[in-house]
Curated annotation (Swiss-Prot):
GO MF term list: calcium ion binding; GTP binding; GTP cyclohydrolase I activity; GTP-dependent protein binding; GTPase activity; identical protein binding; mitogen-activated protein kinase binding; protein homodimerization activity
NCBIfam families tied to this protein: folE, PRK09347.1-2, PRK09347.1-3
PROSITE patterns named among the record's database cross-references: GTP_CYCLOHYDROL_1_1, GTP_CYCLOHYDROL_1_2
Sequence similarity: Belongs to the GTP cyclohydrolase I family.
Gene name for this UniProt entry: Gch1
Annotated spans, Disordered: 1-58
Source organism: Rattus norvegicus (Rat)
Name of the protein described by the UniProt record: GTP cyclohydrolase 1
Induction context: By cytokines such as insulin, interferon-gamma, and phytohemagglutinin in adrenal gland, macrophages, and T-cell respectively.
Subunit structure: Toroid-shaped homodecamer, composed of two pentamers of five dimers. Interacts with AHSA1 and GCHFR/GFRP.
Regulation (activators, inhibitors): GTP shows a positive allosteric effect, and tetrahydrobiopterin inhibits the enzyme activity. Zinc is required for catalytic activity. Inhibited by Mg(2+).
Amino acid sequence: MEKPRGVRCTNGFPERELPRPGASRPAEKSRPPEAKGAQPADAWKAGRPRSEEDNELNLPNLAAAYSSILRSLGEDPQRQGLLKTPWRAATAMQFFTKGYQETISDVLNDAIFDEDHDEMVIVKDIDMFSMCEHHLVPFVGRVHIGYLPNKQVLGLSKLARIVEIYSRRLQVQERLTKQIAVAITEALQPAGVGVVIEATHMCMVMRGVQKMNSKTVTSTMLGVFREDPKTREEFLTLIRS
């Protein structure tokens, strides 16, 4: 029996033909150009890359992509146990990356307070869940944040919210650490900021070297945390206590 044109089969299951390299594609909606001369201190107020409307619009395409993955693995997306899997996986992936729908200004605008406090503020052991952008598998761990105020303080729960916004994206741990520190610095203009992340990467546990007990530790030190060894040591001692 002749196969329908425009359709190919993988492991006996029909699959939509992928566009050939170089083939014309629908024009993508261009993003507005970034404003020139923007001040670095305003970078934390940048717009969100994804909206709820984008989620609804892209969910069918994302589910179709998961169906294609199942076929390529030799599975039948139509069997009972997998009937709803593409939609579940698509919805889950949108949740895992929901940080793209949020901005720092959403969280911080009403939670920055004038306060004459000049001693270190630390929130440690903040649970963190993120997705490795290289293998699309999770890495999980804890985040420790400290900053030295400069006439302003931040609501403590907002530090955890900053972690949530940046970790719920496709990430590498090194960049995540720096993004958290830079966001706090640009929003508060403190004397200094320190961020340390300890995480276990599933791409090292479930594949590759398969080391169950390995942890990756990254740090970013800004301001006096970078320039003054005593301040840095105080922070590192307190998060270990």
